[in-house]
Design a protein with these regions (language model features):
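A beta-strand edge to alpha-helix "cap/lid" segment located at domain peripheries
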Residues: 25-154
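Bacterial N-terminal signal peptides
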Residues: 9-20
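N-terminal secretory signal peptides that target proteins for export/translocation
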Residues: 1-5
Length: 154
């Protein structure tokens, strides 16, 4: 290849540019489906909380999932399933998500949102609005939540 041949270099640049655009188009074309899937999972989590449905979390949370809660506690998947099984010590009275945004990075998606809830947990009433971040990874054909973090909103 002759470095002094500008036509050759321009041609290679144009080919690389179009190849890059094709990949970008393919990824962004898939994003609306992923955004919808993750948004649905977030809204399904609210329904699971309101109905006390641990099966949802058994299915959606990765085995090594963790959550850093707004009260400074870390929870594991086993902790959440145990809490949900004890309906005497966990009841969601109300919950509503707002400002839900989903960003997709290949097989990873990050959801951020505000969560306003009123719950009874271990005999303590908590009524707060938090800002939260959930991280999902595509594992096989399913999206699994691998991490979550919530902090009280100001």
């Amino acid at each position: 290849m002759n470095a002094k041949n500008p036509v050759l270099w321009i041609s290679l640049f144009v080919i690389a540019l179009f190849a890059g655009l094709s990949v970008t188009r393919a990824q962004s074309g898939a994003q609306p489906d992923v955004v919808t899937a993750i948004s649905n999972l977030e809204n399904d989590a609210v329904r699971a909380n309101l109905t006390g449905d641990p099966a949802f979390y058994q299915k959606v949370l990765a085995e090594d999932w963790t959550r850093g809660d707004s009260d400074g506690t870390f929870y594991t998947k086993a902790d959440i399933l145990k809490l949900m099984a004890d309906t005497k010590n966990l009841k969601t009275n109300s919950e509503k998500l707002s400002e839900l945004k989903v960003r997709v990075y290949g097989n990873t998606a990050v959801a951020t949102y505000k969560d306003t809830y009123d719950i009874m947990i271990m005999g303590e009433r908590r009524a707060h609005t938090i800002i939260a971040t959930d991280t999902f990874v595509k594992m096989g054909s399913a999206w699994k939540q691998v991490a979550s973090r919530g902090s009280e909103a100001k």
